[in-house]
Design a protein with these regions (language model features):
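Extracytoplasmic/secreted envelope proteins and their assembly/folding machinery
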Residues: 80, 102, 106, 181-184, ...
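N-terminal, Lys/Arg-enriched amphipathic/low-complexity engagement segments
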Residues: 22-67
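Conserved kinase catalytic-core segment
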Residues: 101-102, 107, 160-235
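Bacterial N-terminal signal peptides that target proteins for export
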Residues: 1-8
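C-terminal catalytic region of ATP-dependent kinase domains
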Residues: 207-325
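Conserved ATP-binding subdomain of kinase catalytic cores across diverse folds
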Residues: 56-164
């Protein structure tokens, strides 16, 4: 879908620069370019008309098997491998507890105007040539068969860069779009967004040969569970009962919405009421059927589709009531 407006900020200085580590990781491939416009959000248009099953992708662009093994990615906390599909496209495959959460979150983030990479849930398939695997061995059989994987497309037209950003250090500080992202991360209980580790900048070539810097939360796997606070043992991912119990909004006071965000980043729990009202206007356009499609795309069981949809509807209604919209 074409989005007609974007939040674009041009800055002359870079955020801190670093490199990803770990064999096979999605390594920064392109130097940062401070002269290119910075984009965090695009107007999604008629949100109520969006298809949250395919999201930013499309059925025609979905991964197509069989898949051939490239390498194992040892970065992060979840088992991952890199593969090529039948059309020669390169994909990052993730297994285990973040698979469903990441795809569902990807659909919601995209629908509300924030930038994402193409992701798909694949129920089963075969990877040829996968030998001597480490932690991915549990999820890829000796015959190459796998079940329940998240596929993320490595788009050569929008490679990741060395530029880093956090929710406190970025070109969008003070904007309603950044405030909306704070609310959105609390809405889906994303507790692992501290620092630049899960935030990336893509260098994308767009129409007319122009280049833009796309700022996105690149790992959405620590969602739809318990934020918990404190040590990581207090947190969970993709646990419906935990998601149902988490508090969303603390209070409204002196023109500020106080979020009950209890993740690794303690500084995103206060949002100007005007910004919160703007975001509530976006989120309230999502229908129950659209939310269901997002969870179906993530491979959720029927009870999970029902439960997550109902809780999100409840949280969005709570937001609307809190901001008076």
């Amino acid at each position: 879908m074409t989005r007609c407006m974007s939040l674009v900020v041009v800055i002359s200085t870079l955020a801190t620069v670093g490199c990803a580590s770990g064999t096979g990781a999605l390594k920064p491939a392109t130097p940062a370019d401070a002269s290119a416009p910075a984009v965090l959000w695009r107007d999604p248009g008629r949100i109520g008309a969006l298809d949250l099953y395919w999201g930013a992708g499309a059925q025609s662009r979905a991964p197509r098997g069989p898949f051939s093994f490239v390498e194992e990615d040892t970065s992060g906390t979840n088992p991952k491998i890199t593969v090529k599909d039948a059309r020669g496209r390169t994909w990052d495959m993730k297994f285990d507890e973040e698979v469903h959460a990441e795809v569902a979150a990807n659909r919601l983030v995209w629908a509300l105007g924030y930038l994402v990479e193409d992701q798909y849930f694949v129920r089963s398939g075969t990877v040829t040539g996968a030998k001597e695997l480490g932690r991915a061995r549990k999820f890829v059989g000796a015959n190459g068969a796998f079940k329940d994987a998240r596929f993320r497309f490595r788009d050569p037209a929008a490679p990741r860069t060395e530029e880093e950003w956090t929710l406190q250090r970025n070109p969008f500080v003070g904007s309603k779009e950044l405030s909306g992202l704070h609310i959105l991360m609390t809405l889906i209980n994303n507790w692992d967004i501290e620092g630049p580790r899960n935030n990336r900048v893509l260098r994308a070539r767009v129409s007319g040969g122009r280049v833009e810097r796309r700022f996105l939360v690149s790992d959405l796997g620590a969602t739809f569970g318990k934020m918990g606070g404190g040590p990581i043992s207090n947190h969970s991912k993709w646990v419906l009962d935990d998601f149902r119990k988490e508090k969303f909004i603390d209070k409204v006071e002196a023109g500020t919405l106080h979020l009950a965000h209890d993740g690794f980043d303690p500084d995103i729990n206060r949002v100007p009421l005007a910004h919160a009202r703007w975001f509530a206007g976006l989120a309230s356009q999502l229908s129950s059927s659209q939310l269901r499609r997002a969870f179906e795309a993530a491979g959720a069981a029927p009870a999970e589709v029902d439960g997550y949809t109902a809780k999100l509807r409840e949280k969005i209604a709570q937001l609307k009531a809190a901001v008076g919209s």
